[in-house]
């Protein structure tokens, strides 16, 4: 199942660059994640928090099978 990073980011009218800045990752990383690339657990946490979500909301962003 595909992650929901792009959908959540766009719903918040946030650019890839802004999400990357807030998460402390590169825009290339955000692009890769939005296209389904795997990443470290620490990167997932950064993305979730940068989207303004709680870590308990992780399944809204990343499907359970990715944890």
Task: Provide a role label for each language-model segment.
Residues 41-59:
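DNA major-groove recognition helix of helix-turn-helix/homeodomain DNA-binding modules
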Residues 1-11:
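A short, Lys/Arg-rich alpha-helix, primarily the initiator
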Residues 10, 21, 49:
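Alpha-helical residues within the helix-turn-helix
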Residues 5, 19-20, 30-33:
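Conserved hydrophobic/aromatic packing and binding residues within compact polymer-binding modules
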Residues 24-39:
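Recognition helix of helix-turn-helix/homeodomain-like DNA-binding domains
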């Amino acid at each position: 199942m595909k992650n929901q990073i792009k959908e959540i980011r766009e719903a918040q009218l946030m650019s890839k660059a802004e999400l990357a800045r807030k998460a402390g990752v590169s825009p290339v990383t955000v692009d890769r994640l939005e296209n389904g690339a795997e990443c470290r657990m620490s990167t997932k946490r950064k993305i979730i928090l940068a989207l303004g979500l709680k870590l308990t909301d992780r399944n809204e962003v990343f499907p359970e099978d990715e944890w």
